């Protein structure tokens, strides 16, 4: 029996029945992955280390080409919310640190291109699936062992943020195709752990608006795309940023001479946050002949100083 090739349909005879089968459509090509990540250009305090993003977002440059260039190719987007947060910060007007001049800032130049880029991103991803990477595109396997709760925090926040920027629900994914194997320098690991552990004390006493930029931002330290030099440079910059943050709630140290068996010495606590902060104060004398009366929890009003008397008893 001759076989007939049909382009539109085929006729099948099964048990005397005639079945009309439509031609099978060609299988759609696998979607092309588009990766939107970038090394950090913004410090934990919201100021920028450089103004390179203003160039990278241009239609002719890497990040701009991915968003501004129209394409009919089926794509799937892997997006890091840390990049989008940096671009959004540019839209609001931003300051760039002057290299080699501590404390000196200049205005950034990328406000308009950042606004256009975010608008174009929302449009270009409208018909494509979008996957949110954990915040900062960090080394997920490393974090799973060291700080799994923080990894979940990075995933949840990035999913919400990316969904907000693209204007639709997005899923979360731990990594993207072609991600590098992490090689995190020891100094960078130490910085990440130091900031993460010291932030814990602030989480219950100050607003998340104050802590989240630091808690989320340090995830970028573990990004596998950072080379050794960039990792060390970023580690030291983030550590400096956190040390400034850490001084917003502090005790002013003083020197006093004790001349009697019972003394009261003043201790000044400074609160640089925009919220009243309640802290527990523990004073431990180094001299075994000195005892200190217990101190109740102390509430320091926002943006103020409070003097707390420390009662000492000298044992003869």
Question: Residues of each region from the PLM?
Answer:
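N-terminal membrane-targeting/anchoring modules of bacterial envelope and secretion proteins
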Residues: 2-264, 268-272, 277-316
């Amino acid at each position: 029996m001759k076989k007939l090739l049909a382009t539109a349909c085929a006729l099948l005879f099964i048990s005397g029945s005639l079945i009309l089968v439509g031609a099978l459509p060609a299988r759609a090509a696998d979607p092309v992955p588009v990766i939107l990540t970038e090394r950090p250009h913004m410090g934990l305090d919201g100021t920028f280390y450089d103004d390179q993003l203003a160039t990278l977002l241009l239609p002719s440059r890497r990040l701009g080409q991915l968003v501004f260039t129209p394409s009919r190719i089926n794509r799937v987007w892997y997006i890091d919310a840390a990049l989008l947060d940096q671009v959004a910060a540019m839209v609001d007007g931003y300051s760039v640190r002057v290299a080699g001049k501590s404390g000196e800032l200049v205005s950034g130049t990328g406000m308009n291109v950042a606004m256009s880029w975010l608008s174009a991103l929302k449009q270009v991803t409208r018909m494509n699936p979008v996957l949110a990477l954990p915040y900062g595109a960090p080394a997920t396997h490393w974090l799973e062992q060291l700080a799994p709760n923080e990894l979940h925090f990075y995933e949840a926040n990035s999913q919400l943020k990316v969904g907000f920027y693209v204007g639709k629900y997005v899923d979360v994914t731990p990594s993207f195709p072609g991600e590098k194997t992490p090689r995190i320098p020891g100094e960078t690991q130490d910085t990440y752990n130091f900031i993460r552990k010291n932030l814990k004390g602030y989480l219950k006493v100050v607003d998340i608006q104050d802590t989240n930029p630091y808690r989320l931002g340090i995830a970028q330290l573990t990004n596998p795309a950072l080379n050794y030099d960039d990792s060390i440079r970023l580690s030291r910059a983030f550590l400096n940023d956190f040390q400034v943050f850490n001084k917003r709630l502090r005790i002013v140290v003083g020197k006093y001479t004790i001349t009697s068996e019972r003394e009261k010495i003043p201790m000044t606590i400074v609160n640089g946050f925009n919220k009243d902060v309640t802290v527990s104060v523990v004073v431990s004398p180094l001299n075994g002949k000195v005892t200190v009366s217990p101190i109740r929890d102390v509430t320091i009003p926002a943006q103020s100083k409070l003097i707390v008397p420390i009662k000492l008893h000298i044992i003869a």
